[in-house]
């Protein structure tokens, strides 16, 4: 995603509050408090992801029920779709008989997503680990098979990652991914989340993920970034701010939502350092700024929680919050 036009944001999203602060050498320095509210230009340092942690499942291709991705036997405990010929009795004479699935069973999984009109991504891949699906399987997108030759090894968060270029298989509007798996043992099935991976933004509409153009301006002061709810990695935010002089100062970022990530602050392209924990303060040396407008860049590296679990830690309520649930409630 490209950057927005230079100076498009001005300094409307920043509020500078000067205060006296002592640095480590005991010298008094002017503290510049930078509000993270408002719109900043944003530039993700890697491709975005759309996470699928829930699918619909069926054993007959007709009756469907929503489940979390997990092993087949765990999904059986979550649903009521197994019965009749899918259940077998086993046990020796004189011992209690046990119910078990009558393997092999053909199981179908499907999930839908939309692509906003006129916003088909220039890069779009299906991404998953090699062990995400256990059991012989076939994957179709809009009724067209994702051929084995399309899969290539990639390294996103694990050496087992693989991705298939699916741009030719999708269309504007509604799309459907269907996975057929031959279940032969309890631990088979669609066991882990899988993803769309590419140059897009992610929205939510009527309980469905929607791929959009990547936002060029976002508000960093949020539990998760609009358009990038499942993004894990480094995100760069940039704006301009007016400084009164080129004197040394201490920079502090002001948040409505506390941030406890690894953060780097750059002024006019020069790094003031990286903070991975509180206090989040950066020493801006004399000469790094100039009187007037200066370019301020904030690089934030978050954890894999957004991508792997679809959650973030709510420090105000001290709990793990589900991103999709919160987005759908907005």
Where are these regions (language model features)?
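Short, surface-exposed beta-strand/beta-hairpin micro-motifs centered on an aromatic residue
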Residues: 279-282
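Solvent-exposed serine/threonine-rich low-complexity stretches and specific carbohydrate-binding patches
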Residues: 145-154, 270-277
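Carbohydrate-binding surface patches
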Residues: 1-4, 261
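An acidic-aromatic loop/edge-strand motif
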Residues: 4-101, 130-133, 151-240, 250, ...
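Regulatory/sensor and coupling segments of signal-transduction and defense proteins
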Residues: 92-105, 109-116
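Short, surface-exposed loop/turn segments at beta-strand-coil junctions that are enriched for proline
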Residues: 116-118, 167-169, 287
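Aromatic-lined ligand-binding clefts that engage carbohydrates, nucleic acids, or primary amines
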Residues: 112-143, 177, 241-269, 275, ...
